[in-house]
Design a protein with these regions (language model features):
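Acidic, proline/glycine-enriched N-terminal capping motif
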Residues: 1-144
């Protein structure tokens, strides 16, 4: 029997999106690499997930992922705007795009929570303003 308990954790700090692969030239050869900022953020996500996965096996079946992406309120905004943002009255349209945050999180969880992100069959996300930026992640194993 496999474990059907969900996995929940928080990735602290301002959310980061998955950066595009870059091309660098080494001699006469082109080389593709992932930007250092993306590698660092994926490492932070994996570390947060490892803390809650201690002693658990990797999820092998399909999963659903839920993200609550919380961006810090910009200091440059007025007190009124900040209050509205924290009350949910100002839409959160700050970069990075939610789909890029989702890609970064899904890729970082390969081999940590599940075997491969191809197992992610369902998902949802919400973007909000908040006092404490971070990404709240919940992985739910689905019955097969």
């Amino acid at each position: 029997m496999f474990d059907l308990k969900s996995v929940s954790f928080v990735v602290p700090g301002e959310p980061q999106g998955k950066g595009r692969a870059r091309i660098g030239k080494v001699g006469n050869f082109a080389r593709m690499y992932t930007p250092a900022k993306t590698v660092a953020y994926e490492g932070l996500v994996a570390l947060a997930a490892q803390d809650v996965m201690q002693g658990r096996d990797l999820i092998e079946g399909p999963v659903m992922i839920e993200l609550r992406i919380v961006h810090g309120v910009p200091q440059s905004k007025s007190k009124k705007w900040k209050a509205e943002a924290l009350a949910g009255l100002q839409p959160c349209t700050k970069k990075p795009d939610a789909d890029n945050v989702l890609k970064a999180v899904c890729d970082a969880l390969n081999g940590v929570v599940y075997k491969d992100d191809v197992q992610v069959t369902d998902g949802s996300f919400k973007r909000r303003w908040g006092d404490t930026p971070g990404v709240h992640v919940r992985i739910v194993p689905l019955c097969q």
